[in-house]
Amino acid sequence: MKQVDCIGLYCPEPVFRARKAMEESEVGEIIEILADDPAAESDIPVLVKKLGQELVEFEKLEDGVLRFVVKIVKEVR
């Protein structure tokens, strides 16, 4: 599983990094995105949907860290 660590980064950087990871991934790959910017809670799911990918899991971890697991279901260009 590819991990995108956006802890300590604020909008719009987590979205930029998540998008780049999705663009560089192959269909079928799983990406884990970690962020602690409160805006990411809404921004990342919107990005995933916009790019046609699948949000497999979302959870709030300790210390305000948000964890998103995304499955790449189609190429992103």
Swiss-Prot record:
Active site residues of this protein: C11 (cysteine persulfide intermediate)
InterPro entries: TusA-like, TusA-like_sf
Superkingdom to which the source organism belongs: Archaea
CDD domains: SirA_YedF_YeeD
Family (UniProt): Belongs to the sulfur carrier protein TusA family.
Protein name, entry field: Putative sulfur carrier protein AF_0188
Organism: Archaeoglobus fulgidus (strain ATCC 49558 / DSM 4304 / JCM 9628 / NBRC 100126 / VC-16)
